Swiss-Prot record:
The gene is nuoN1. InterPro entries: NADH-Q_OxRdtase_suN/2, ND/Mrp_TM. GO terms for biological process: ATP synthesis coupled electron transport. The chain crosses the membrane at residues 9-29, 38-58, 76-96, 104-124, 126-146, 161-181, 211-231, 246-266, 276-296, 304-324, 329-349, 375-395, 410-432, 461-481. Belongs to the complex I subunit 2 family. GO terms for molecular function: NADH dehydrogenase (ubiquinone) activity; NADH:ubiquinone reductase (non-electrogenic) activity; quinone binding. It comes from the Bacteria. Its EC number is 7.1.1.-. GO terms for cellular component: plasma membrane. This is NADH-quinone oxidoreductase subunit N 1. It is found in: Cell membrane. It is a multi-pass membrane protein.
Length: 491
């Protein structure tokens, strides 16, 4: 068999890996005082270089297949890869100002997690999907615990590790059953086998195959925090350092969705997807309703965003039943809008933390508009985006998902979207109202905490980018949506 080494399509992954190794070498060879800035420059540079290499793949200018079909860096992979790299870039900026002893390891792990996420979008083989899941998971397990003084972070990391290991077992067992039924781990081969199961208008697939696909969906649903596999999310979001929570909220959801789309496009013929994937639609409905409803009683902003993420995972599943061009482009658009809004909210938390205040407590948001008017306005815009109020990207994203659901006949998830949006509007408006409530006493810094202006400045930059992105996606939906449709037309 001839060697099929297409390093052109592997370049984005290699750039991230090289950046991580460079950061570790800088820490090994030079004094910390001289390389703090260069480490962040190296991390940002690695992400930008990886994005640069994805652009030709977006344009379709390079052969997307390599390594005997195990890696498929086509336009689909490029679209989701750019979304993931954008999340990684903003997370690096949010991380500026971490304590001395963990900077190099933290940044290297962040790049390796991003590498695993991008790999999932370009997976052409079941084992590559598993490799991507494990690469991002192992990095995140450690990143969550990167808060030496906080026992909550260690507890969150342990919970995520234990439950993540169980989810990985479901995933690999499902892959084993699919392999046994289809006789191949290649997604292309699985697609051919799935079509061969069709006879006389019926899909006569075996039980092992159905169970295998179901178990694989369970493993990926855990990463997306779909009900009932969401139990880890609130505690992990609350306990993890804020930049890690922000990165997880966007990155794991986007990467797991990309892998799920890859798998289901291959494993289930499109004509049979609405009926075969009905249980997934029910899980999506449950996720929307639980995420929106339980958020009402939250007093911690990070836990609130965890339940928001659960609901938004359900929204993404609206693109699954048809898995056509409309669904995939709508999901990519909504992920970008959700990513900007979510990253911006966590930037506000980070700004408060830079002032020595516990930014995750909703009570500390009281009077935010009067202490910092532009931060308060940005927070309002971001939550309007999460609700889906025009002219924000969230409105356009939900509208496109609704269209995809109607065309795919997914009435269950469409009903969930309408009901949960109304409930979550109450939750998010309550947060906005808190920020615009006058108070005579400003929140005081916690004991032992001191203001850190550089961290605040970096978080303000992220907040400005996130707010601008939310508005641009709402004001100029046509060009962006058409660009995504063109890019995903060959999926």
């Amino acid at each position: 068999m001839p060697v099929d080494l297409n390093f052109t399509i592997a370049a984005p992954l290699l750039a991230l890996a090289a950046g991580a190794l460079l950061i570790l070498l800088l820490d090994l060879l030079f004094r910390y005082e001289t390389i703090q800035g260069p480490m962040y420059v190296a991390a940002v540079g690695a992400v930008l270089v990886a994005g640069w290499y994805l652009v030709p793949l977006w344009r379709g200018a390079a052969e997307p297949f390599g390594f005997h079909g195990m890696l498929v860096m086509d336009r689909f992979a490029a679209v989701y890869g750019l979304v993931l790299l954008g999340a990684a870039l903003l997370a690096i900026l949010l991380s500026f100002g971490r304590v001395r002893e963990d900077q190099s390891g933290y940044l290297a792990l962040l790049l390796w997690a991003a590498m695993g996420m991008v790999l999932l979008g370009g997976a052409g083989n079941l084992m590559v999907i598993f490799l991507g899941i494990e690469l991002l998971s192992l990095a995140l397990y450690v990143m969550i615990a990167f808060a030496p003084k906080r026992m909550a972070a260690r507890e969150a990391a342990f919970k995520y590790f234990v439950l993540g290991s169980v989810a990985a077992a479901f995933l690999i067992f499902g892959f084993a059953l699919i392999y046994g039924a289809a006789g191949t781990m290649s997604l292309t081969g699985i697609a051919a086998a799935a079509r061969s199961f069709t006879s006389e208008g019926a899909w006569s697939v075996g039980l092992y195959y159905k169970v295998g696909v179901g178990l694989a969906i369970v493993g990926l649903a855990f990463k997306m925090a779909l009900v009932p596999f969401h139990i880890w999310a609130p505690d992990v979001y609350q306990g993890a350092p804020t930049p890690v929570t922000a990165f997880m909220a966007i990155g794991t959801k986007a990467a797991a969705f990309a892998a799920m789309a890859r798998l289901l496009v291959a494993a289930v013929p499109q004509a049979y997807q609405p009926s075969f994937l009905l249980p997934l639609s029910i899980l999506a409905f449950a996720s929307m309703m639980l995420g929106a409803t339980v958020g009402i009683w939250q007093s911690d902003l990070k836990r609130l965003m965890a339940y928001s993420g659960i609901a938004n995972a359900g929204y993404l599943i609206m693109a699954i039943p048809g898995l056509g061009l409309d669904g995939l482009s709508a999901a990519a658009y909504y992920l970008a809008a959700y990513g900007f809004a979510t990253m911006g909210v966590f930037a506000v938390v980070r700004i408060l933390e830079a002032d020595g205040v516990d930014g995750s407590q909703l009570a500390n948001l009281k009077g935010l508009f009067y202490r910092s008017p532009w931060v308060g306005v940005c927070l309002a815009v971001l939550f309007f985006g999460l609700i889906g109020v025009p002219p924000t990207g969230g409105f356009v994203g939900k509208f496109l998902l609704a269209i995809a659901a109607v065309r795919g006949g997914a009435w269950i998830v469409l009903t969930g979207l309408i009901l949960s949006t109304g409930i979550s509007a109450y939750v998010y408006l309550k947060v906005i109202g808190t920020a615009f409530t006058r108070t005579k006493v400003a929140p005081q810094p916690e004991e032992g905490e001191e203001p850190h202006p550089p961290t605040r400045t970096a978080a303000q930059v992220v907040l400005a980018i996130a707010t601008a992105g939310t508005l641009v996606l709402g004001v100029l939906p046509g060009p962006v949506s058409e660009l995504l449709r063109v890019a995903l037309a060959g999926m």
